[in-house]
Amino acid sequence: MAGDLRQELLAYLHELDIRPVCAEHPEVFTVEEMMPHVQHLGGAHSKNLFLKDKKKKGLWLVSVLHDRQVNLNDLAKKLNLGSGNLRFADEASMLEKLKVGQGCATPLALFCDRGDVQFVLDAQFLEGGYERVYFHPMTNAATLGMTPQEFVTFLKKTGHDPIIIHFD
């Protein structure tokens, strides 16, 4: 399934005239496992969190620079949800909405979402002067990179205007 979705994603990117670079690597489940395989790729690498609110009415996919620590209480306040109202969503929700499972959370899966997931992006991806930004392409056995401008084009075409947050 991941292979088919990856091909669908690559075809979608091609339709948008986005020509990403892709690096294959062993399957990884954490940023710490991933970095030795991709640190040679210059640019911004990501850590992605799939979250829900306390009342289970909202879902958020959050992409931050790979070495950031995210305080969920602080993030909830920045999203005007009130402290203590964000928590990790279960894998079943991620599979239903984004078609990827644990260890594969990626904003590139937003092309599968039908408007149920809000996307939060670390401002540094756009303001940090990076030549490329990197995410998993529907599988945690590869990393795909594109320019920040191409990434924004992708997001907007999927109907996801990113909520840009400064985590500094």
Swiss-Prot record:
| CDD domains referenced in this protein's UniProt entry, alphabetically | PrdX_deacylase
Q: Using the record for this protein, list the coiled-coil segments as residue ranges, or answer none.
A: none
InterPro entries, per database record: ProX/PRXD1, YbaK/aa-tRNA-synt-asso_dom_sf, YbaK/aa-tRNA-synth-assoc-dom
User: Which GO MF terms does the UniProt record name?
Assistant: aminoacyl-tRNA deacylase activity
Q: Which Pfam families match?
A: tRNA_edit
Q: List the disulfide bonds.
A: none
Q: Which family does it belong to?
A: Belongs to the PRORSD1 family.
> What is the name of this protein?
Prolyl-tRNA synthetase associated domain-containing protein 1
Record organism: Xenopus laevis
* Organism phylogeny: Eukaryota, Metazoa, Chordata, Craniata, Vertebrata
Q: Which gene encodes it?
A: prorsd1p
